[in-house]
Swiss-Prot record:
Organism in which the protein naturally occurs: Borrelia turicatae (strain 91E135)
Region entry Disordered, spans: 127-151
Coiled-coil portions: none
Domain of life: Bacteria
GO cellular component: a single term: cytosolic large ribosomal subunit
Subunit structure: Part of the 50S ribosomal subunit. Forms a cluster with proteins L14 and L19.
Name of this chain's protein: Large ribosomal subunit protein uL3
HAMAP family: Ribosomal_uL3_B
Annotated family: Belongs to the universal ribosomal protein uL3 family.
Length: 209
């Protein structure tokens, strides 16, 4: 499936021809290079291994350098992602935004903002206890255990804990504008992650659903 590695710049708004204001997220793309291939004959499926953003020289080890020894003019990359189902490119090829010209909807994967340790009401949208005078558990979780049987709290019970910092995919975001000169696209709506975080942009898997 066609995809690129991009960077979330932030949100703004644009006016459509009919005067409607549309909130958009700006996503920038540094050059994306094919740094490896997988084939049905050798690996059981077709895929391209893509890389973006040059790795700092202090982070480049000999094993990493060896992976790029057969690639001319391609430096080791910080972000490396495998896109399944893609073929027709060779190692060392650059894939630009022209690949998205005919695409109207995309799926974007990113890491959500970390919120730190949060209570059950914020983390899981629990209603909490009574807010009025006399209650002693306004924002408490409530009971988590069972009766005599099974006499324990089950694993996975929703409780307070670390919130955010998880991988999340938003599907069917409309591509509002593509600026090939500035290597950027505008997509309608919000995208997971903080400003400057890197995201994976793929052709929408379930258009119209």
């Amino acid at each position: 499936m066609l995809g690129l590695i991009g960077k979330k710049v932030g949100m703004t708004q644009v006016f459509q021809g009919n005067g409607v204001v549309v909130p958009v997220t700006v996503i920038e793309f540094e050059p994306n290079y094919v740094i490896g291939k997988k084939t049905v004959e050798r690996d059981g499926y077709d895929a391209l291994i893509m890389g973006s953003v040059d790795l700092r020289s202090s982070k480049i080890s000999k094993p990493i350098r060896g992976q790029y020894k057969n690639l001319e003019n391609v430096e080791p990359k910080r972000y490396v992602i495998e896109f399944k189902g893609l073929k027709g490119y060779d190692a060392g090829d650059e894939i630009g935004l022209d690949a998205f010209r005919e695409i109207k909807y995309v799926d974007i994967t990113g890491t959500t903002k970390g919120k730190g340790f949060q209570g059950a009401m914020k983390r899981h949208n629990f209603s909490g206890g009574p807010s009025s005078h006399g209650s002693k558990f306004h924002r408490h979780l409530g009971g988590t255990g069972q009766a005599t049987t099974p006499a324990r709290t089950f694993k996975g019970t929703k409780m307070a804990g670390r919130m955010g910092g998880e991988q999340q995919t938003i599907q069917n975001l409309e591509v509002v504008f593509i600026d090939e000169e500035k290597r950027a696209i505008l997509v309608k709506g919000a995208v997971p992650g903080v400003k400057g975080s890197f995201v994976i942009v793929k052709k929408a898997k379930k258009v119209g659903v």
